[in-house]
């Protein structure tokens, strides 16, 4: 709710009405396409985990593997960071795999995904560092420092929150160190399956980014956003998700603040952020809800 409060602080009532009108005008075909791509990413994530389970000597049910991913994200929307525990428990109970090993494989997945996101971040910086630096050092930003003090304050708050979040995870990282090692072992045991695992990991991120990119075309006013800004804005959104329940509130705000540095109006950035977040949230709630209902039935019948 803190980030919703910040959003209300940086927008006027007229701007909020404008954002809502933009969202209502979104073309449904692009929204459906974005939701489908987001769902594909989560489905592929479930399929990818099966390679890790086989690497440690366990077979897993495909529906359970995929359903656990949606359940994970649904849980995160209710209780931050609870999803991994829910997913590990589901995979352990329904596939008859020791929970320590499921934690290990999930930790391995996390490390792979973080590595990919950091790689994309570095790539964005190398390809567009001149544009990024120019946007923050041109006359519109630093020369009007007094007018941008609120923006600077909010960016500082986001950075502090990220630092606090990272520090809070240090102890948990120590606790799950053995599980992470187990996960690494599952990666090394992939052997000839490693190329397929890498391809699936790449497809996950391609789908996520494509969903973010497609939603830009759903509202005519979003055309003002240069395509070269979409990838860095996507990465900003990715790193902001961990700051609240599945990125609620902070995801659109982070994207808006980033685009504001490039002269994109706040209402445009928030429209893009809320549309992208909502598409993924709807998919998560629908398929997550179905998974919470269907998976226990499958387990009972099994």
Describe the residue ranges of each PLM region.
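Re-entrant/interfacial helical elements at transmembrane boundaries that shape
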Residues: 84-93, 245-261
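Hydrophobic, aromatic-rich membrane-embedded alpha-helical segments
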Residues: 66-93
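Predominantly cytoplasmic-facing regulatory/coupling regions of multi-pass membrane proteins
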Residues: 1-69, 127, 131-241, 264, ...
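Membrane-embedded alpha-helical segments of transport systems
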Residues: 71-79, 103-126, 275-286
